[in-house]
Amino acid sequence: MFRLEFISPLGVFDSGLGGLSVLREIRREMPAASLHYVADSAWVPYGPRGDEFIQRRSLALAGFLVEHGADIVVVACNTATAAAVPLLRQSLDLPIVGMEPAVKPATAASRNGKVGVLATVGTLQSARFAALLDQFSSNIEVLTRACPGLVEQVEAAALDTPRTRALVEQYTAPLLRAGVDTLVLGCTHFVFLRPLIEAVVGPEVTVIDTGAAVARQVRLVAGCLEATGDRAGGVEFWTSGDAERLAAPLNALWGGRVALNSLPGEYVGQSA
């Protein structure tokens, strides 16, 4: 059996810093794994962008990770998963692990059959999400809410400011009035707002995200690779955005001081 400190790195990308919530769970699940993370912060948020643009960016970012040795690519973004994972799987000869809003576990957790989903416009309008609802919502009522502005708050590491709290209250209020007892965080950025969201919705509402489940899936896909070793694996970070400006939010969200590298120009893209 191989030891993770000697294998190729696992590659992870997101529209920005939200995917760090998934990276954190992967590191917890596979502490000896070498990890490479790319934040496409020049183009965040993906939510309002078209599928073709997201597909181009996803191919570029996955290509960068493969060029740097990744043998598994994790799309730590619900919007990019919905728009680009089928194309990535057609284009790349390696495992691709994506995100999926936790509608299935939410249906099991709900006591009254009313589930709320907070996500981006891109995720909520995708065929993938529609298929997910068709599959799991026959016996429950699913209420959705797009959340413009929340991704940007997380990108700034503004996790509990008056502005962020006001947005969370605005987006959860109609779901609470409708009586949801289970709330799905359908965007990896929103996981960083979980303490605030739980404080706003109260203890009677169960909040669910899929980060830990995705990390377990990554370990399963890794197959014969051990999840432990003699030392912790390294983590390297890149961004298409302004690395100097993003360093402070990255350190705040990751929980430690790390180096942030700039993507080479050919991977940054020119226009939306």
Positions of the model-derived regions?
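Non-catalytic structural scaffold of enzyme domains
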Residues: 1-272
